Amino acid sequence: PSTLSPAPCTLHKTRQDSPFRPGRRGGAIPAEENVIIPNIPDDKVEAILAEPLLKTYVPNPGPIMSGLVSCTGSQFCGLAIVETKANGVKLAKELEATMNIPNEVRMHWTGCPNTCGQVQVADVGFMGAMAKDAAGKPTPGVNVFLGGRIGHDSHLGEQITDKPVAIEGDLLPFVQNLLVEKFGASML
């Protein structure tokens, strides 16, 4: 059997020592808030991969999309300063389309300082804040955090921006440079 974990997700063969081995029931939603569907019979994998839902929640996401986490953002939260989900997905797609990124980079978005998106434990975290555009007008932006880790060598990431970076126009090149300098990425 195989295990499918969409949104962002990965499809892989189940090993004998896996907690998702045959005979085990149910799915799982791990801390990263992905969905894992275990025990898919091999003869059903292709049919499941053809499901319309998996056009949006792809089974083999790229190195940014696979580690993307977001709070609900301003779409559903009155405390959020910025829209997190749409901006996170847009940035992930732009980065993956313009860069060679050798390893997964966990990026977390949170719309406000309450940090429901847990930006301080991400490789790169984005906390919603108001920035200024090129004309000096207020625009949605983010404070950027770097270096958070969970697990054995856990520690909180640190804010690396002195002032918020405007999401439109400034954030993409800022993060591209960050990925080149800190994560071994290169431009395509």
Regions found by a protein language model. Give the residues of each.
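Mobile "lid/hinge" segments at catalytic clefts and subdomain interfaces of large enzymes
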Residues: 1, 120-187
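Small-residue-enriched alpha-helical segments and adjacent helix-cap loops
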Residues: 2-139
